[in-house]
Amino acid sequence: MQHLDKLVAQVLESINTATDVATLETLKVEFFGKKGHFTQLMQGLRDIPAEQRPAVGQKINDAKQIAQNALNQKKEALENTELNEKLAKESIDVSLPGRKSALGGLHPVSITIDRVVKFFSELGFTVANGPEIESDYYNFDALNIPTHHPARADHDTFWFDAQRLLRTQTSGVQIRTMQTTQPPIRIVAPGRVYRNDYDQTHTPMFHQIELLYIDKKANFTELKGLIHDFLKAFFEEDLQVRFRPSFFPFTEPSAEVDVMRQNGKWLEVLGCGMVHPNVLRNVGIDPEEYSGFAVGMGVERLTMLRYNVTDLRAFFENDLRFLKQFR
C-alpha cells in the first residue's frame, strides 16, 4: 500500500499546482480515466489473494475518493476565479451616462381627442361609440336628411350597397343612444368618419367628435355658453367667438361657430344647433317635453388650428420629423 500512498500524494500535488480547469481535466483522465492509475489498481485486485481483495479494494476506493474530492474542490475554486475575472473585465461603469431611450408619443389627433373628451367628461358627458359601417337609416333617414340630399350622392359617400355605407358622420351614435337611453342624455362621441374627398384640407378618412345633450328646457343659451367655455379651454386663450346662422337637416336653429385668430381673420371651428323635433320623434322622444342641442367638430381641423399645421395630409404620412414635435 506504500505505492497507493505515493499515488495519492502525487495526485494531490498535481491538483494543487494546477492553474486552470483544462489542466484539471487532463489530470482527471490521467488518474481516473479508463486507463488511469486508479482504474489500473482496481483491475490489479485479481492478482492478489481472494481473502485480501475486500480490504485492499476498500483502501483503493478511499484513496480515490480523497483524490476525487480534492480535484472537485480545486475545479470549483478555479471556475470561480475565472468567472470573477470575466465579470471584472465585463463590468459596467454605472457612473457613465447611459444611452438615451427613444420614447414614443401620442399622435397629435389622439392628443386632441383626449383633450376634448376630458373637457366634456368633467362636465358629466359620457363617451359613446358606434359602428363605422352604418345603415342609411342611422346615417341619413333618422337624422332628417331627405333622400334627395346631396350628401347621399356617390361622389360624397362610400356606399357598399343601396343601404350600407361608411358613416359620413358620428351622428348615428346619437340616434342609437337616444333609442336605448331615456333623457336626460349627455354624450360625447369621437370616431372615424369617411367622405369621398382628398386635397390639402380634406382626406377620405378623418376624425369627428359630436356632442348630444337632451333634457327638459335645454336651450340655445346653454349651448352658446358651453361652446364658449370649451373653445377658451381648448385653445388656452380668451378668443372672440361668433355664431353664424346656418342650416343642418338635423338641427333647428343651426349655427356655425367661428373664432378670431391672431391674424385678425375669422375661422370656422365647428357646427351646432338645437336638435330638430323630427329627429326626436324618430327616436320616440316627445319634442313637446324634451329639447336638446348637438355639436359637431372635425378633430383634424381643431388640431391644425391649435398647432398651426397647414396641410391636413401631414397627419397621415407618419413622418417622424413631424410627429416628434408633439411629444
Swiss-Prot record:
Main location: cytoplasm
GO biological process assignments: phenylalanyl-tRNA aminoacylation
Reactions catalysed, as given in the entry: tRNA(Phe) + L-phenylalanine + ATP = L-phenylalanyl-tRNA(Phe) + AMP + diphosphate + H(+)
Pfam families, alphabetized: Phe_tRNA-synt_N (PF02912), tRNA-synt_2d (PF01409)
GO molecular function: ATP binding; magnesium ion binding; phenylalanine-tRNA ligase activity; tRNA binding
Annotated positions binding Mg(2+): 252
Xref: SUPFAM superfamilies: Class II aaRS and biotin synthetases, tRNA-binding arm
EC number: 6.1.1.20
Annotated PROSITE patterns: AA_TRNA_LIGASE_II
Record carries keyword Chloroplast: no
Cofactor binding mode and count: Binds 2 magnesium ions per tetramer.
Cofactor(s) required for function per UniProt: Mg(2+)
InterPro entries: aa-tRNA-synth_II, aa-tRNA-synth_II/BPL/LPL, Phe-tRNA-synth_IIc_asu, Phe-tRNA_ligase_II_N, Phe_tRNA_ligase_alpha1_bac, Phenylalanyl-tRNA_Synthase, tRNA-bd_arm
GO CC annotation terms, alphabetical: cytoplasm
Subcellular location: Cytoplasm
UniProt keyword annotations, A-Z: Aminoacyl-tRNA synthetase, ATP-binding, Cytoplasm, Ligase, Magnesium, Metal-binding, Nucleotide-binding, Protein biosynthesis
NCBIfam families given in the database record: pheS
Complex formation: Tetramer of two alpha and two beta subunits.
Similarity comment: Belongs to the class-II aminoacyl-tRNA synthetase family. Phe-tRNA synthetase alpha subunit type 1 subfamily.
Listed name of the protein: Phenylalanine--tRNA ligase alpha subunit
Taxonomic source organism: Haemophilus ducreyi (strain 35000HP / ATCC 700724)
